[in-house]
Amino acid sequence: MSEAGEGDEFQLRSVQVSDAVQLAFDEWPARGPRIVFLHATGFSRGCWRPHAQRVAARSQPVSLDLRGHGASSKPPAPYRWSLLVDDIVSLLVAEDWSNVLLVGHSVGGATAVQVAARLPERVAALVLVEAVVTPDRPPAAAGAGEAPSPLVERTLRRRARWSSRAEAGRYLRARPPYDSWDAEVFAGWLDSGVIPTDDGGVELSCPPWVEASVFTETRGSTAAQDLAHVSCPTWIARATGDRGLRSTCPPQVAQTIPTASETVIEGSGHFLPLENVSVVVTLLNAALDHMGKASSSDG
């Protein structure tokens, strides 16, 4: 249990979702609809902690580590995006979660789209922030040969070990993309994104080989094919690409989901939710307001 405070009361839990994978997540007390937060490639559940804390008084946030990340299992590669979807579907079914607000950034957003399409009876609303969905590019066949991208090569060369958490924090905070993150977001990520090693040091909780495998499998994503099958109310935050990494969420995403509304954030880039907590919280509250009205009308 974390330190006292309404938004800080969370516990680390884990659930076996397949023979090879156990998913870990921070869970807050139930004070309203369940919100399930899905992070981007290479990050961890702690990235969403400030957002969760700001809506914990009216919801039940669940911030989880995708397979290969944080405290979740790290099975061998490949890390196909379809497996990430299968994990979340299995979690919602195993725990019998319904009336869920699903929130995703980057690969987490793509995963959220596909989970909502597969489980419309359980997912009541979506908030997608810079979801990696490419309607104009057909998915590649599984195992299709392609030379490693510069992104993958850089990822595999990334430094992943330090003598202490403090050293890791200083090293990472001085470098992009972490140098532009909100201070609370960075603190939450450092808490779950860096873990102790047996020799007394620390290392990234998402090994570079896992992150590289997720990047390699991007072209196999079929999330774009599921956009039209999303039936729940959807709020989309899209960056203009004017800051840091370019936007990965084209306008076609909002245009293809029948129930979507889109907010374009000027002067922002792909790491929007990690730099601007308030933008995401505004969308979360809008979704929770809508869910509350829908629940009242049903009753």
Where are these regions (language model features)?
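Active-site loop/oxyanion-hole signature of alpha/beta-hydrolase fold enzymes
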Residues: 50-53, 62, 66-107, 282
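Alpha/beta-hydrolase fold catalytic core
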Residues: 1-37, 56-59, 97-98, 285-299
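The conserved beta1-alpha1 loop
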Residues: 38-40, 105, 238
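Conserved serine/cysteine hydrolase catalytic core
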Residues: 184, 194-255
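Conserved hydrolase catalytic core segment
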Residues: 98-142
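Conserved HGGG/HGGXW glycine-rich cap/lid loop of the alpha/beta-hydrolase fold
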Residues: 24-74
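Helix-rich cap/lid subdomain of alpha/beta-hydrolase
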Residues: 138-201
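Catalytic histidine-centered segment of alpha/beta-hydrolase-like enzymes
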Residues: 268-277, 281
